[in-house]
Design a protein with these regions (language model features):
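Glycine-rich, flexible N-terminal cofactor/catalytic loop recognition
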Residues: 28-104
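Glycine/small-residue-rich loop that forms an oxyanion/phosphate-binding "nest" at active or ligand-binding sites
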Residues: 111-158
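Class I SAM-dependent methyltransferase SAM-binding "motif I" and its flanking Rossmann-like core
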Residues: 139-186
């Protein structure tokens, strides 16, 4: 809706430029406010629990409506890097509370997420692709299941499957043993 509004404003020439300036004045000065001044669309009601949501691996438009609805309904989003997830939330026009969850997160961090998931909606995302694939989120999922907290997913992009699908190799059997290191070892 915001993109359509900007397109309409820009097509009106000089008058449109004044309207854009007025809209910029209404944008929040809060560095964690990733939305324009218009409120989020109402979230679809979903049950409390932990939701594993895949994020795009290169094109921000590659996200399912169900995944967007889960993000919209989230009380808290567990993220690897708030800067990366912030870009996605901005693209979607959402303003949400985020909490870091990564390799260096403590048991106390995990317990804090579970406390919210007992009565609210916690969404776990990775920087790109499906959480828990070469990712520390499995500890959170295991702890949620042990605590009797519902766990669900909105599947989507996976770098492993995307690479396999364009490799030309047979796809009926394959082994994933982790991603190649990003830096050569000395």
């Amino acid at each position: 809706a915001a993109r359509f509004a900007f397109d309409q404003i820009l097509s009106n020439g000089a008058c449109g430029a004044a309207m854009v300036a007025a809209m910029v004045m209404y944008m929040s000065s809060d560095p964690y406010d990733y939305s324009l001044s218009e409120p989020d669309k109402p979230a679809k009601a979903i049950d409390s629990g932990l939701y594993i949501v895949a994020t795009p691996i290169g094109n921000l438009a590659d996200m399912s409506q169900r995944a967007i609805d889960m993000l919209r309904a989230a009380d808290l989003i567990a993220v690897e890097d708030s800067r990366v997830t912030g870009k996605l939330l901005h693209h979607l026009g959402l303003k949400k509370r985020m909490r870091p969850y990564h390799d260096h997160s403590s048991e106390a961090d995990r317990d804090a997420l579970l406390a919210v998931a007992r009565d609210g909606v916690v969404v776990l995302v990775s920087d790109a692709g499906t959480p828990l694939i070469s990712d520390p989120g499995y500890k959170l999922v295991r702890a949620a299941r042990e605590a009797g907290i519902a766990v669900s997913t909105a599947p989507g992009a996976s770098a492993v499957i995307a690479a396999l699908s364009i490799s030309g190799l047979p796809t009926d059997r394959f082994l994933f043993a982790g991603f190649l290191p990003s830096k050569a070892k000395a």
